[in-house]
Amino acid sequence: MATIKDIANRLGVSVSTVSKGLNGASDISDELRQMVLDTAVEMGYATKRSKKVENRKLAIFIENMDYEAATQFGYEIVLGFKQNAFRHNWDVTVIPVTPAFQLAEKYDTYMLKNGFCGAFLVGFALHDEWMKQLEQTTMPTVLFDNYIKKNPNVAYIGTDNYEGIDAAVDHLYTLGHKKIAFLNGSLHSMVSEQRQEAYYNSMKAHGLEINEDLTVYGYYVADSAKYHVPTFLGAGATAIICGNDLI
């Protein structure tokens, strides 16, 4: 485990300067503070504060998902996490993020400088900058409907997309439908890719023809349907499977 002195030696600065950078002191430059934080993360440093039992701060980073109203998809996900955290005496901060935010702030550095012990990431896309950084993160992290290989610090939870889509195809097949369209969600999403694969597999398993005109990526919003349903109907679809509830 790296020490403050190790960081100081790496950067060629004093121990007190490193301490100021780690603790957010105002009498060093933003550039030097960022350099200290980035180096601390690179060297695997953990502050004493983050190792203390009483420091129990978690972050929920959320992107591409509404969560503030009870009717929105992310509401119960965020609420459930916060309720369970509260029962175990954890403080939770919900932080909406954007692609620009991820480019401006390195994940581990942001966690370290804000004293977070772990995080729950919801709604992220496969090509997001932080998803790349999570391959090497040392911070305890849980992903919702996403997956990072070969990093024991990153776990995930999610739905069984294969079983769900297969059940939908099977239900429509038993009702006599043969031309089943699939309006998927956003491209570059792990769940979209899995649901697309599940659709293809289930159609083949039921002996149904796959028509590429009946399979499209849209977006996880209600307006997505109006752009594609007319095309589906024109191609002879008698049933449509949607990638999520909003569509």
Residue ranges and their predicted role:
Residues 43-107, 117, 200:
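Amphipathic helical "hinge" segments at domain boundaries
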Residues 117-119, 239:
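Short, Asp-centered acidic motifs that coordinate Mg2+ and/or phosphate
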Residues 127-136:
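Active-site-adjacent beta->alpha loops and helix N-cap segments on the catalytic face
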